[in-house]
Amino acid sequence: MKLTMYMGRAGTGKSYACYERIREIITTCPGEPIILLVPDPATYRTERELAAFMPEGGFTTVRVVGFGRLAHQVFQSLGKAREDSLSDIGQKLVLRLLLKRHADKLEVLRRAASQPHFADVLQGLLAECKAFRVTAEDLRSGADKVDSMGLAGKLRELAYIKEQYETMTDNLWGSDEDSMEELIRCIGDSPLLQQAHVIVDGFHWFTPLQNILIQRMFALAKESILTVTLPAETEPERYARPGQLFYRPYEVYATYKERYGKQLLVRRFTKQHRFQSPVLEALEKGYFAYPSQGNQSKDTVAVVRAYNREREVDAICRRISSLVREEGYRWRDITIMLRESETYGDILEKGLAQYGIPFFTDRRHPMRSHPLAELLTGLLEIVQSRFNHDAVFRLLKTDFFPLSREEVDLLENYCLEFGIRELMWLKPEWTYRRRDTGPEGSDSYERETLRVSRIQNIHSRIVPLWQLLWDFGRQSHTGYEWCEHLYTCLESLHVPRTLSQWSREAVAEGLQEEADSHEQMYKRVIRFFDEVMLLAKTELLAPDEIAVLLREGLDEVTYSLGPPGLDHVAVTTVERGYTTESAIVFV
């Protein structure tokens, strides 16, 4: 089977040639399936570009997919779509349970295993092992070859954890690599790949597991095309030294050159089409060149320095407004590219909103401060802290309780005034009142009586839940029982109904992002409960252990949104920055 490789620098027309080939296939071979595999963050942009490229403004026989979407569609075509795959939170839960169960067998990693978020590190390590096809036996073999006893011990314990993890998740799909292995096994049975035209575009490098999948797809395909970002004006072997700028694309070339030999047809692209500015074209060609060359054009790249991030963002927003208002650009012509979203994300979003600039950011927003997250962690915290004042009122101010904010403030002032703390919350009645209220029957006495009566009414609405939490939350229970209890608490507080109401109110006010956050948060919490009940159904968990699991699980919960329209400023990061056709880019 032949493989056509499109080779060229960035902007030389490789993707455009892929679109042209797709249009040609649709014209000459209507009905034949086409698979366009691109990086997951690029699927939305690629679909839009390809639809705009087609004469009819759309397509029906082309599937634009990333690895994740490809797996889902193949499994769906075979009736293998499964709901019991583990989320990232579920995978970390498995690892934390394993570390708890087998703590006595860990000597080198025992101290690290007790640290917060160690499961995150372990999950990433196991995912890397899977992607690079490193088995537990490989880890043990490596342990036998190293001189350091500490390193050897770590490798052996990692091998043991890896085996236990794979055993525990044998009937579940965990990481993306797990689904990819299953995809490799069954992709040949799917009708989606039978006699399909397969085009792979936008990647700089592949893991060994991805390489196996792509080669399997090419073997099933009627036609195969792969793009590689390598300078076509020189021989690829020039970049064969590790550490060079184009070394990883060269590895892709070398891998497929070795596999296909004379069946590999290389089409070279040398003419630059993307960069309209001479300085950008020179920058792309010479930035990593040696010896370095100066700018020979009259154009320059503006480098702006600001006093702090807020002023930097303000300058960007003013410049964007000027470009649109005075120079005829549209919002969609502009992209802001960040090194990482955490540093600038909130500041930038606030600045763009203040200037009335429509924007879309592809970052995932953390949900740890969502009222539902505060509620769940607070339900456990008040028991652990024996009804600490701050914990109690942080919980009451989530607005899920049948109390108004005025009533919460009234209750808080009363508790501060009379020193109500800890187990005093569980008393069925509070009779504390001010002494200097005058004789019985006086106006001041009646006002105080009315105030105490109101406080008692407020207290009576929450003390049953406090008592339920206290009676249940002091002892160890199975993961199933903990989740059942927490869900019962959510139901008793009418949390689903409240979130639905908040979501409708947000939509009515035009706050679609806030509305979506309520819906996604509730779904993720229910998913978390499902996974705990599945994985720790009979596992006894102490109150502090379930609290750690819940806290770490909620820390991982994020939400993302789709673009609200087509005309907006795109805010992305270097790693996810596939919006390469913008006329104006702020880095």
Task: Describe the predicted segments one by one.
Residues 1-49, 192-195, 199, 204-389, ...:
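Conserved motor-region signature of P-loop NTPase helicases/translocases
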Residues 148, 152, 156, 164-165, ...:
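Accessory C-terminal helicase-associated subdomains
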Residues 31-141, 149, 153:
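Conserved P-loop NTPase-based nucleic-acid remodeling module centered on helicase motor cores
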Residues 55, 70, 102, 106, ...:
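ATPase/helicase motor core of nucleic-acid motors
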Residues 2-6, 14, 101-202, 236-240, ...:
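Accessory N-terminal region flanking or inserted into the helicase ATPase core
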Residues 63-69, 197-206, 210, 225, ...:
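Conserved helicase core region in the C-terminal RecA-like lobe
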Residues 5-10, 166-215, 304-316, 320-323, ...:
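PLD-like (HKD) phosphodiesterase/transphosphatidyltransferase domain
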Residues 79-99, 287-292, 377-396:
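A polyampholytic, Gly/Pro-enriched intrinsically disordered region
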